[in-house]
Amino acid sequence: MRNKNFLIIVIGQIISLFGNAIQRFSMSLYLLEFTGSTAVFSQILAISTIPYIIFAPISGKLSDSVNRKKIMVYLDFFCAALIGIYAFILLRGNDSALIVGTVMFILSICYTLYGPAVTSSIPQIVDEENLTSANGIINQVGSIVNVVGPILAGILYGLLGIKVIVIINAVSFLLSAIMEMFLDIPDVAKNDESTEKLVSMDFIKKSFGDMKDSFVYLKKEKKVVLAIIASYAFCNIFLVPILSIVAPYFINVLLELPSEIYGIVEGVCVLGMILGGFWISIKPKMFSMKKVHYTYYPMIAGVTLMSILGFIKINNYAMATIFAFGGLLIMLSLSLSNVLTLTFIQKQVPSNMLGRVSAFSVAVATISVAPGQLLYGQVIDMGIPLGIILIVTVIFNIGLVVFIKKRVSDTVVESEEKAA
């Protein structure tokens, strides 16, 4: 795909995602070691989602009002400076729980503002016929980075600790910002309301009003899109915590394996995203929204495989291998379904609404992260066997597949039949 702007976004995403993957992995281990409790660990992660909830409405309005290149560049420079300052604090040995929490809180704000700008810019720089492949490529290259990141982070964390990882992340944000300065993204079409001051109470009030308007719009005009967004929330409650809460507990605490092994396990899990992104990029016509529920079948198989580990006793490394393969199947499902549904949303929602709808989607998905993390953290701390937890997870996710089939796949089929 010969497209300068798309190439820059892809390279910029590789660089910044590389830093993010390393930081996410290392901070998970850092917090788990620091707190010593799965419940407290999950609570801290849940609190870090609060900025997403608060700033998601503003991010959509911002993305539909300001040039999306400027949003990406300014935020990456800011993150580079913030993490650079945090690296300086770490090197001086002045770190504390308050500082860690503050840095995570501010970074969460930046991620919230950044996401809709990237998502909304893709349809501006890529032709509609190449949109599915473009989203697949972005998903794929990001996934490759996410495979290498945890493995390298596990080695760095085990050998050198958190300090080196934070420095690497600061550099990655700086390089990403420099790359994005060469983007050429046109301004979005503006109405009279978009000329108001961005930093004002009116802007903030209208941003939250836009969130409500997005919901009303989707409920009336795009019910399938609303159902897709609801499925994202369901995944974040009953699926994602397996990788964010259960995985570090199972590998590092229950099996007592080193951080390097956890890095490899997470890398194998993310390999599923590479396979999914590669598959849908080269064979986009194999997948359609009429059968989107099929993409969730590997996820059911993966969680079922993981649940077996709660009832067998074999070599710890063999158990970690089985867990990793189950995670690979989960990520394969998420990769295929996310690219397919994201492309569908981009085609269905008008450009002047896309940023706000993307922000609404992020808000709903993010609000659902905290309950999932808290739920899994608490049930693990209560001493409920991991096998039982995962069997219940399988049941809930079978319900998700049924929901997707009835509310998304069948609805798309009915709409196409009416249009024919």
Task: For each feature predicted by the language model, list its residue ranges.
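C-terminal transmembrane bundle of multi-pass solute transporters/carriers
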Residues: I54, I71, A80, I85, ...
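A single, central transmembrane helix in multi-pass transporters
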Residues: I162-I167, K206, D210-L275
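Helix-loop junctions on the cytosolic side of multi-pass membrane transporters
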Residues: S120, Q124, V166-V199, K405-E417
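Structural signal for membrane-spanning alpha-helices in multi-pass inner-membrane proteins
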Residues: S28, I83-L90, Y157-G158, S176, ...
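Helix-loop interface residues and adjacent transmembrane-helix termini in multi-pass membrane transporters
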Residues: N3, F34-T35, S65, N94, ...
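Substrate-agnostic recognition of the 12-TM MFS/MFS-like secondary transporter fold
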Residues: L7-R24, L45-K61, N67-L82, I99-G158, ...
